[in-house]
Amino acid sequence: MGYVVKEEDSQTGEVTRRGPFVTEKEARMVLANAVEQAYDFNPQLAMANVRQEVEDAVRDGRKDCFDAKGNLVCRYTIEQE
């Protein structure tokens, strides 16, 4: 039993899994890194306070990322296996 971080690309439907991780804390750290990289490297995403977005993701265990028009671009979630 472990935790995985799933990234879903809403445009292609592709799902990428990272893990499994032994603890939820590990998964949350990977989630934080993934969200930070998404905002750093994806020009589609709306300008945001990246630090706040990462903090929200770690707190909630999930993050939806939107473009400037409000369209969902990607979704990150932590799931227990």
Residue ranges and their predicted role:
Residues 33-81:
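Short, mixed-charge low-complexity intrinsically disordered segments
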Residues 21-22:
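Conserved aromatic
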Residues 1-17, 26, 33, 45, ...:
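Short aromatic-glycine-(Arg/Gly/Cys) micro-motifs in beta-strand/loop hairpins
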